[in-house]
Curated annotation (Swiss-Prot):
Belongs to the sirtuin family. Class III subfamily. It comes from Pyrococcus horikoshii (strain ATCC 700860 / DSM 12428 / JCM 9974 / NBRC 100139 / OT-3). This is NAD-dependent protein deacylase. Zn(2+) binds at C124, C127, C150, C153. Pfam families: SIR2. It catalyses: N(6)-acetyl-L-lysyl-[protein] + NAD(+) + H2O = 2''-O-acetyl-ADP-D-ribose + nicotinamide + L-lysyl-[protein]; N(6)-succinyl-L-lysyl-[protein] + NAD(+) + H2O = 2''-O-succinyl-ADP-D-ribose + nicotinamide + L-lysyl-[protein]. GO terms for molecular function: histone deacetylase activity, NAD-dependent; NAD+ binding; protein-malonyllysine demalonylase activity; protein-succinyllysine desuccinylase activity; zinc ion binding. It comes from the Archaea. InterPro entries: DHS-like_NAD/FAD-binding_dom (IPR029035), NAD-dep_sirtuin_deacylases (IPR050134), Sirtuin (IPR003000), Sirtuin_cat_small_dom_sf (IPR026591), Sirtuin_class_III (IPR027546), Ssirtuin_cat_dom (IPR026590). NAD(+) binds at residues 20-39, 98-101, 190-192, 216-218, 234. Substrate binds at Y64, R67. It is found in: Cytoplasm. Transmembrane segments: none annotated. CDD domains: SIRT5_Af1_CobB.
Length: 249
């Protein structure tokens, strides 16, 4: 099946990738839904909400500081780099991710759409201020503050991520849906396919006559519409797939 999938990719003009927590789990980042997603006995869905932040911003910030420290230790894995290779080969047009860990960008992906935000970005709860902490070099400063404040207006800063119950950013979502309509192939990597509206992306590709390739350690909500299902770790499968594509080209 690997050779057949490689042939599909090699002959495609417009491929997109749609990635979820599974691709980052291989870099050692706990998934929200897994048993290792717990922090101090709290479930993420108890903390990653606007209500929790309003009730106890310090608790929510402590949770995010813990996640930031964990993610800072993580490195992109072979799956991230394989997607970069496909982009360099001119096959992959964009990566649409549900992850907030910045690993795709760190690996070198150029055209990246982050549907759920980025844990290294902060935004003000009052004014328009936004900041990417890796770019500004202020990660340590934010981690050392009890409650990070906006340098412009002094209001509370919050992580620039999408919390449970919040809408996805319309610009990114519209762009992702547009790419999905135009794509002839989507590579779905490590997503449960349960978080909507993001999970519509493979369905849009399918409805537009495209091919759905899924790479996952287990079956997901996307599997029923997948034309190809490659079971296993993305870090093992994607590099092999890239090798096969190279051989064909």
């Amino acid at each position: 099946m690997m050779a057949e999938v490689a042939r599909v990719l090699a002959s495609s003009k417009n491929v997109i990738a749609f990635t979820g927590a599974g691709i980052s789990a291989e870099s050692g980042i706990p998934t929200f839904r897994g048993k290792d997603g717990l922090w101090k006995k709290y479930r993420p869905e108890e903390l990653a909400t606007p209500e929790a932040f309003e009730r106890n911003p310090k608790l929510v910030w402590d949770f995010y500081k813990w996640r930031i420290k964990k993610i800072l230790k993580a490195k992109p894995n072979p799956a991230h780099y394989a997607l970069v290779e496909l982009e360099k080969m001119g096959i992959l047009k964009a990566v649409i991710t549900q992850n907030v860990d910045d690993l795709h960008r760190e690996a070198g992906t150029k055209n990246l759409i982050e549907l759920h935000g980025n844990i290294f970005r902060v935004r003000c709860t009052s004014c328009e201020f936004r900041e990417h902490l890796k770019e500004s070099g202020r990660i340590d400063e934010i981690l050392s503050e009890d409650l990070p404040k906006c340098p412009k207006c002094g209001s509370l800063l919050r992580p620039d991520v999408v919390w449970f119950g919040e809408p996805l950013p319309s610009k990114e979502l519209n762009e992702a849906f547009k790419l999905a309509k135009e794509a002839d192939v989507v590579i779905v990597v490590g997503t449960s396919g349960l978080v909507y509206p993001a999970a519509y992306i493979p369905y849009i590709v399918k409805d537009s006559g495209g091919v759905v390739i899924e790479i996952n350690v287990q079956k997901s909500g996307i599997t029923p519409i997948a034309d190809f299902f490659l079971r296993g770790k993305a870090g093992e499968i994607l590099p092999k797939l890239v090798q096969e594509v190279r051989r064909i080209l």
